[in-house]
């Protein structure tokens, strides 16, 4: 399910097509717990990309779709306990990439738990290769997605048959996800440390050219047309290779002087809040990462 969700909502939501009339609900209800029939679903595996799709704290079967699926005997439910981010266009990021690799591993015969672990590792490796770091949205994806169900369960479909065959792998049969991804390391003062991504809000508007601000705002507006463009928040981010810098890294010092380091990237964040027909408030967030040449190198939007 590639739908929206909310922390306090029992439903998962769609999103209004830009070509629809403005009076059409911005987030129409797509799925309710009572839409899931009471008949058992002993062969179902569910992956939800919705924000809070697996948030079950203080919830019951009819206030959580994840619990509803489990109550109808779904063998596995994967979802996020927090915000979930995905792509608006290729390449895949966040929950979209995680879901893709998860289903590939399940189809290849991996147990559900191993499939999710390998999907997380693949996401981390791909982001490290492409970006050189894991940003906060990558971290949230890796940490927030969980599996409810038996992690040793293997789900396979016979060729030409819609029926799924269920089997289990004992602990000794389940292989590890594989070698950990590699990251750059530096040594300072005899201490080894990996690079840390520093992200700081840009308060001095002169650090961002009006032309770049206008161009990125226009890009963000195409995804969240109802949001107020003046509410765009800009942050600078770069890798810090200094251990225990006590917030005296080059990014902080440069920004204090009214400059941005050449290797710094800018992250533009826009939020939109809207009430659903059930009076739940849904917040949607879109983040665009822009390199030093003004190119949008990553675009992530919350589910």
Name each model-derived stretch.
Residues 280-300:
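A short, surface-exposed beta-strand/turn
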């Amino acid at each position: 399910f590639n739908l929206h969700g909310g922390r306090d909502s029992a439903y998962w939501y769609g999103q209004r097509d830009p070509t629809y009339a403005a009076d059409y609900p911005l987030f129409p209800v797509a799925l309710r717990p009572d839409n899931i029939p009471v008949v058992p679903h002993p062969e179902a595996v569910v992956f939800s990309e919705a924000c809070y799709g697996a948030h079950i704290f203080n919830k019951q079967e009819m206030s959580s779709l994840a619990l509803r699926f489990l109550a109808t005997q779904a063998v596995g439910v994967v979802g996020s306990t927090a915000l979930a981010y995905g792509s608006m266009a290729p390449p895949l990021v966040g929950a979209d990439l995680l879901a893709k690799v998860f289903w590939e591993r399940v189809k290849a015969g991996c147990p559900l738990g191993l499939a999710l672990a390998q999907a997380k590792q693949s996401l981390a490796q791909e982001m490290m290769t492409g970006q050189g770091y894991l940003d906060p949205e990558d971290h949230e994806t890796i940490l927030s997605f969980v599996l409810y169900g038996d992690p040793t369960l293997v789900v396979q479909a016979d060729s030409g048959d819609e029926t799924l065959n269920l089997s289990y792998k004992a602990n000794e049969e389940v292989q590890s996800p594989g070698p950990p991804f590699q990251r750059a390391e530096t040594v300072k003062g005899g201490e080894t440390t990996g690079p840390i991504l520093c992200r700081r809000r840009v308060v001095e508007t002169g650090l961002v050219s009006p032309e770049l601000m206008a161009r990125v705002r226009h890009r963000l507006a195409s995804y969240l047309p109802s949001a107020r463009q003046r509410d765009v928040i800009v942050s600078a981010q770069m890798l810090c290779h200094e251990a225990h810098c006590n917030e005296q890294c080059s990014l902080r010092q440069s920004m204090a002087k009214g400059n941005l380091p050449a290797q710094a990237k800018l992250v533009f964040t826009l939020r939109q809040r809207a009430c659903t027909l059930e009076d739940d408030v849904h917040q949607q967030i879109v983040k665009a990462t822009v390199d030093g040449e003004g190119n949008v190198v990553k675009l992530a939007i919350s589910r």
